[in-house]
């Protein structure tokens, strides 16, 4: 599992990016966020996640808020 901080997340569009220290930013879609109810992330929030290869490159999967 990787760890990072949410760079930004757009609730209306349902996606954003996670900053990884020493690495490239990783795309995150709301469907990758674990948990119940409305799935969103806050700027600066710490998360753990896996990186998978999506249609447009690397993206976050199994995102857990820390």
From Swiss-Prot:
It is found in: Cytoplasm. One of its GO terms (molecular function) is DNA binding. Keywords: Activator, Cytoplasm, DNA-binding, Stress response, Transcription, Transcription regulation. The keyword Cytoplasm applies. CDD domains: CSP_CDS (cd04458). Its main location: cytoplasm. InterPro entries: Cold_shock_CspA, Cold_shock_domain, CSD, CSD_CS, CSP_DNA-bd, NA-bd_OB-fold. GO terms for cellular component: cytoplasm. SUPFAM superfamilies: Nucleic acid-binding proteins. Residues 4-63 form the CSD domain. SMART domains: CSP. It comes from the Bacteria. Induction: In response to low temperature. Transmembrane segments: none annotated. Affects cell viability at low temperatures. Homodimer. This is Cold shock protein CspB. The lineage of its organism: Bacteria, Bacillati, Bacillota, Bacilli, Bacillales. The gene is cspB.
């Amino acid at each position: 599992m990787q760890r990072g901080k949410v760079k930004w997340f757009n609730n209306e569009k349902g996606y954003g990016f996670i900053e990884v220290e020493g690495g490239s930013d990783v795309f995150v879609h709301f469907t990758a966020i674990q948990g119940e109810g409305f799935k969103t992330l806050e700027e600066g929030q710490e998360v753990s996640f896996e990186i998978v290869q999506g249609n447009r490159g690397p993206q976050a999967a199994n995102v857990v808020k820390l």
